[in-house]
Design a protein with these regions (language model features):
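Membrane-embedded beta-barrel scaffold of Gram-negative outer-membrane proteins
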Residues: 312-314, 318-324, 328-334, 570-635, ...
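Short acidic/polar hinge/loop motifs at secondary-structure boundaries
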Residues: 97, 106, 122-148, 167-169, ...
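N-terminal periplasmic accessory domains that precede
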Residues: 85-88, 105-107, 132, 158-179, ...
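Gram-negative outer-membrane beta-barrel transporters
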Residues: 470, 599-601, 620-720, 781
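Acidic/polar loop-and-plug regions of large Gram-negative outer-membrane beta-barrel proteins
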Residues: 232-234, 238-312, 330-378, 425-449, ...
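Structural signature of Gram-negative outer-membrane beta-barrels, strongest in the C-terminal barrel
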Residues: 236, 378, 397-409, 451-602, ...
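Transmembrane beta-barrel wall of Gram-negative outer-membrane proteins
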Residues: 176-178, 183-213, 218-255, 297-312
Length: 784
């Protein structure tokens, strides 16, 4: 009698499923399709699921791919109490996340920012315009996948250092319930509820809800609320449906940090002796003190939905169409500048030198300047139509993927920058104490202008992984993109609200770009546990500069040029190429290692070099100055090791070396390129390191007792191109202990920043934000 057996295989980094096999039973061949079930004709079969990486879309074992990938499973996030992307990135070598303004998160991979973030394989298009933005919590996440190196061949523009893919929990037929409540330092309350199973007929579901509130250690209270629902299943033998809906409403405190570090060497007025060096922080500041205005706020409201349909014709062809829609609203008001009072007269106790004159400075009082009011409302439509499958030509097996991607981004940005008109109230003109910050009064706001932008992207792509033989694999991939952008600024709002009348199409300025991207690589597998690879790949990033009478333009050779007013392209796209070699080793479930050595070259970066109203060389500028400044590159290597010596114990370590520098900068009247060549690129540490250990006792009277600890290191980070300002390097240690009760409840105590390290990883200009000191989190979680 034959008994059917269904096995559900996870997609985590090292998950394998093993059943006991009869001698003489034939082995099941690997298939490139990521089937969720297998029908087995015998009750006893041996099967091992090769680790696959969804971000590459080919459904082949990771050992076949000439790329570097890393995966963080949800188990790691849960063990370490991680619910945000900045904490998760500490366990990804070569990745750094920096938060600014309290909630805007900027991700750099292998030294380059503007990195692409995806959710369930769908690009977050906010990165097409902005370099930082708030991001969702991670409570509904199954795993985080990182594809390093240029990825434009699969995901289009701007994928230079890599792509981060957030994979949310999929619907499953297995009934499950997960509930967690946690409470910790600074009134940190977290509640999460997840459940799922079979809904009716062929449909399964998975749902997750999360609420978090925290007073904050610097009186920076925050609230986060999110919900997620996934529905799906096999409608027939050939058809699958997957529907996902997510929403969030988050409130964040804006964050302007502590008063400025010293802008120059500071001297005492009484005797001209030096009091502080340039860059020193004032002594005696209360790091828990909050200097923001009482009226500051930041909301992020988001709704996203996707529908995926897949039809399988057979092993040779599978057609997939995925349509998604995202609405995102970032609503912000923040006082951004803490300025010391200054005077040309010797009325204060200190002064600094500006050229040949003395500027007297009051280090006891502050002026609250530049309250900034804006709201970005973005609507994105994304459709991916793909055909993939497997066929054979002679002795060569082909795993192919071809597709067409259409993306439309409609963004309306509203601003209220006219102080006194758009921002008003007693808090606008207040002055405060450096050592005793307090409320300066309320402020209210309105919008006066709207900035309207539209982006359209069409991508046509094809990739093929050729299995030449058991030991040699080859990847060939190409993509052609059409990109268009249009914008109009200064559109009047209606009654100060986030509303406007759409201007005529003739008032928009436009730019358009088309380009080809590629990736090619070889994999050699000398023995089953070891694979060696080499690859080369390219990327591009369109330039959205449009013509303006108020701007002067310089090319990458330092020469001024005068574009045509009707030109569709002012600057060439930013381009880059990566060469990479690496090795991957996996011995059963005991030991795994990944190593990669890379070089990335980037051309045509565009920057603002001077702003209208600035005084340069004694001249007050009547126009903005913008130009493509030259070339930079990133050289380095990544290493990650995981060792499981005994049952229940896992040790993982990772190290990233990333040396990103300016290599060629043309000199022009507004940029001294010679002094910048060789400087380190901003926001990227040279060294990053982590190690973590998870141990759970599986037998005896202490069965269910678990221990976790991690140590991370971040090297100093330069904050500017001139390499004059840095975030100092620091080590961080976290630890936790947990115990699983017989009733499926796990109790856990997390201690973060065990050694109370004093560190900085965030700043607003010269206003540094201190990191959180030692803190605790106690949680109880139930799983069924």
């Amino acid at each position: 009698m034959k008994l059917p057996l269904t096995l559900f295989f996870g997609l985590g980094l090292t998950l394998t499923t093993t059943l006991h096999a009869q001698d003489g039973q034939p082995k099941r061949e690997y298939t490139n399709f990521q089937d969720t079930t297998f029908q087995l004709s015998e009750i006893s079969v041996t099967a091992k699921r090769p680790m696959q990486v969804e971000v590459m879309k080919l459904g082949v074992p990771a050992a076949y791919l000439p790329v570097t990938t890393n995966t963080l499973p949800s188990r790691l996030l849960a063990n370490h109490g991680i619910t945000n992307i900045q904490d998760a990135a500490r366990f990804l070598p070569g990745v750094r996340v920096q938060t600014s303004y309290g909630a805007f998160q900027q991700i750099s991979i292998r030294g380059f920012d503007h990195s692409i973030i995806m959710v369930d394989g769908v690009r977050d298009e906010r990165s097409s315009i902005d370099n930082s933005y708030p991001f969702m919590d991670l409570t509904s996440v199954e795993r985080i996948e990182l594809l390093k190196g240029p990825a434009s061949v699969l995901y289009g523009q701007s994928a230079v250092g890599g792509v981060l893919n957030i994979v949310r929990k999929a619907p499953t037929a297995q009934q499950h319930v997960n509930a967690r409540v946690a409470y910790g330092s600074y009134q940190n309350l977290q509640t999460t509820l997840g459940f799922g199973g079979r809904l009716f007929g062929p449909l399964n579901y998975s749902a997750n809800f999360n609420y978090q509130t925290q007073d904050g250690w610097r009186d920076n209270a925050m609230r986060r609320l999110s919900g997620y629902l996934a529905l799906g299943g096999k409608l027939s033998e050939a058809d699958e449906l997957d529907i996902r809906i997510g929403a969030l409403r988050d409130f964040y405190p804006t964050e302007i940090g502590l008063p400025d570090v010293m802008p120059a060497d500071i001297y005492r007025t009484a005797d001209d002796t030096k009091a502080y060096d340039r860059g020193d922080m004032l002594p005696g500041l209360d790091k828990k003190a909050r200097y923001n205005s009482e009226s500051d706020f930041m909301y992020n409201r988001n709704f996203n939905a996707s529908v995926m349909w897949r039809h399988t014709f057979g092993e040779a062809a599978r057609l997939t169409d995925k349509l998604s829609y995202t609405y995102d609203d970032i609503d912000y008001f923040g006082t951004e500048d803490l300025a010391y009072l200054t005077s040309d007269k010797p009325i204060y106790k200190h002064y600094y030198k500006s050229g040949n004159r003395k500027v007297y400075i009051n280090l006891d009082s502050l002026r609250y300047d530049f309250p900034l009011r804006f709201e970005h409302i973005a609507r994105t439509w994304n459709n991916q139509l793909e055909l993939n499958g497997r066929f054979t030509t002679g002795s060569v097996k082909h795993n192919y993927l071809g597709g067409y991607s259409l993306i439309a981004l409609y963004r309306n940005s509203f601003s209220g920058y006219d102080l006194g008109q758009d921002v008003y109230g007693p808090g606008l003109t207040g002055q405060g104490s450096v050592y005793n910050p307090h409320s300066l009064g309320w402020m209210d706001t309105r919008f006066s202008k709207a900035f309207v932008s539209r982006i359209y992207m069409h991508g046509f792509y094809l990739q093929d992984l050729l299995e030449l033989n058991e030991k040699l694999k080859m990847l060939l991939a190409g993509r052609y993109d059409l990109y268009s952008y249009k914008r109009v600024s200064g559109v009047p709002t209606i009654d100060g609200r986030a509303e406007f009348e759409m201007p005529a199409d003739s008032l928009f300025t436009r730019t358009a770009t088309s380009t080809f991207s590629f990736r090619a690589g070889l994999v050699y597998i000398p023995t089953q546990p070891l694979s060696l690879f080499a690859s080369v790949g390219s990327y591009f990033k369109p330039d959205n500069t449009t013509y303006s009478d108020n701007t002067r333009y310089f090319d990458r050779n330092g020469r001024e040029f005068f574009p045509n007013k009707d030109s569709r392209k002012i600057f060439d796209p930013e381009r880059g190429i990566q060469v990479e070699v690496g090795a991957r080793y996996e011995l059963d479930d005991k030991l795994s290692a990944d190593f990669s050595l890379f070089y990335i070259n980037r051309e045509n970066e565009r920057q603002y070099m001077a702003y209208k109203g600035e005084v340069i060389n004694g001249e007050k500028l009547d126009k903005y100055v913008v130009g493509q400044v030259g070339r930079m590159d990133s050289r380095g290597f990544d290493l990650e090791l995981t060792y499981r010596p005994i049952r229940g114990l896992s040790l993982t370590a990772g190290y990233g070396y990333t040396d990103t520098r300016l290599r060629k900068i043309a000199t022009n009247p507004y940029l001294d390129g010679e002094n910048l060549v060789g400087k380190r690129y901003a926001n990227s540490p040279l060294h990053s390191f982590y190690v973590y250990a998870d141990y759970t006792i599986r037998e005896g009277v202490l069965r269910g007792l678990g221990f976790n600890f991690d140590v991370t290191y971040q090297d100093e980070v330069y904050r500017d191109f001139s390499n004059t300002s840095t975030f100092p390097s620091y080590w961080m240690t976290d630890a936790s202990i947990s115990y699983r009760l017989p009733n499926r409840v796990r109790l856990r105590l997390n201690v973060n920043n065990v050694f109370n390290t004093d560190y900085y990883n965030e700043a607003l200009d010269s206003q540094y934000v201190p990191g959180m000191p030692r803190n605790f989190l106690i949680s109880a979680a139930y799983s069924l």
